[in-house]
C-alpha cells in the first residue's frame, strides 16, 4: 500500500451524524452556504468536484461558496469568525475548540483516517519517540498532529517540555522546515506528509492509527440553529459523496492527487 493509499481509505463506520433535537421553525433561507474544502478531507474534494450541494440547493436559489482551509485550526478560525458556515476538522481539534468557547456544533463524521504521524528526514538518527528529547519539533498548535505528538511523548515518558516546539501557521510550513533542516522532526499531516515521503524520502518514524481522531464536519452553532432544515440536506450530500468515495476509490485518488 502506498503512502497515499494507506491514508486515503475511508472507514466504513464513518458517516455518523450528531444531530440533536432541532426547531421546526427556521430563519429566512440564506443566499449562500459557505463550506470548506481541504486536502486533509478528500470527501470534501469529491463533494466539490461532483457538485452535489449545488444540485441540492439549486431549486432554492441558494449558492454554494467553497473556501479552502489548510488545517483544523484554520477551519476553526474561519468558523469562529463567521467566515464559513461548515468546516472540517479533526475530532480532537473540534473538542478543544468547543471547550475554549468556539461556538461550533459537530454534526457528522466523514472519515476515520490515518492522517498524522511523526516525521523526520531520511538520514536522521531519530528512530523512536524517545529520540525527540532535546530536539526541535514543528507543529501547528491545537491540531490533531499536535495532540498526536503530545500523546506520543506521554507514552514515551516525556512531555512537551522535553522538546523545543516550533509553532507554524500551516502544516506545509512544518514539512518545509524539516526538509530544510531547520527542525529535527515534524508532527505531520497528509497529503503534505505523503508528498515529502515520495519526493524527499522523509520517514514516518512513529505511527499509531488508533491515536488519529475522526474527521469531523462542524457547523457554526448560530447557522445550525437558524437553518436547522438545511443541515440534514448538507449531510445527505456529504453522505452521498462519502459513499461514492468508498465505491470509486480510484476516482477519489485521482481527485486527491
Question: Which residues does each predicted region cover?
Answer:
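Residues that recognize and position ribonucleotide moieties
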Residues: 2, 46, 217
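A generic structural signal for well-ordered alpha-helical segments enriched in polar/charged residues
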Residues: 15, 55, 155, 236, ...
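Sec/Tat signal peptide C-region and signal peptidase I cleavage site
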Residues: 22-26
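Pocket-lining segment of extracytoplasmic ligand-binding domains
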Residues: 92, 165-166, 171-257
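N-terminal secretory signal peptides and thylakoid transit peptides that target proteins
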Residues: 1-16
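Hydrophobic membrane-targeting alpha-helices
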Residues: 17-21
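Short, glycine-/small- and polar/acidic-enriched structural segments
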Residues: 27-160, 165-174, 180, 184-190, ...
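Phosphate-coordinating loops and pocket residues in cytosolic domains that bind phosphorylated ligands
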Residues: 11, 134, 198
Amino acid at each position: 500500500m502506498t503512502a497515499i493509499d494507506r491514508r486515503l481509505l475511508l472507514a466504513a463506520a464513518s458517516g455518523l451524524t450528531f444531530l440533536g433535537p432541532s426547531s421546526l421553525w427556521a430563519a429566512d433561507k440564506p443566499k449562500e452556504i459557505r463550506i470548506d474544502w481541504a486536502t486533509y478531507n478528500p470527501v470534501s474534494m469529491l463533494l466539490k468536484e461532483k457538485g452535489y450541494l449545488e444540485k441540492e440547493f439549486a431549486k432554492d436559489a441558494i449558492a454554494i461558496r467553497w473556501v479552502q482551509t489548510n488545517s483544523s485550526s484554520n477551519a476553526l478560525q474561519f468558523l469562529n469568525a463567521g467566515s464559513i458556515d461548515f468546516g472540517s476538522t479533526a475530532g480532537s481539534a473540534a473538542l478543544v475548540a468547543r471547550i475554549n468557547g468556539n461556538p461550533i456544533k459537530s454534526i457528522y463524521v466523514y472519515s476515520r483516517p490515518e492522517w498524522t504521524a511523526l516525521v523526520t528526514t531520511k538520514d536522521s538518527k531519530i528512530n523512536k519517540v524517545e529520540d525527540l528529547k532535546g530536539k526541535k519539533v514543528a507543529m501547528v498548535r491545537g491540531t490533531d498532529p499536535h495532540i498526536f505528538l503530545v500523546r506520543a511523548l506521554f507514552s514515551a515518558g516525556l512531555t512537551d517540555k522535553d522538546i523545543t516546539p516550533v509553532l507554524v501557521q500551516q502544516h506545509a510550513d512544518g514539512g518545509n522546515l524539516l526538509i530544510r533542516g531547520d527542525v529535527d522532526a515534524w508532527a505531520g499531516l497528509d497529503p503534505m506528509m505523503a508528498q515529502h515521503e515520495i519526493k524527499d524520502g522523509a520517514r514516518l518514524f512513529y505511527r499509531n492509527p488508533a491515536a488519529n481522531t475522526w474527521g469531523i464536519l462542524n457547523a457554526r452553532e448560530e447557522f445550525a440553529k437558524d437553518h436547522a432544515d438545511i443541515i440534514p440536506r448538507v449531510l445527505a450530500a456529504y453522505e452521498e459523496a462519502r459513499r461514492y468515495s468508498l465505491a470509486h476509490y480510484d476516482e477519489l485518488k485521482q481527485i486527491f492527487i
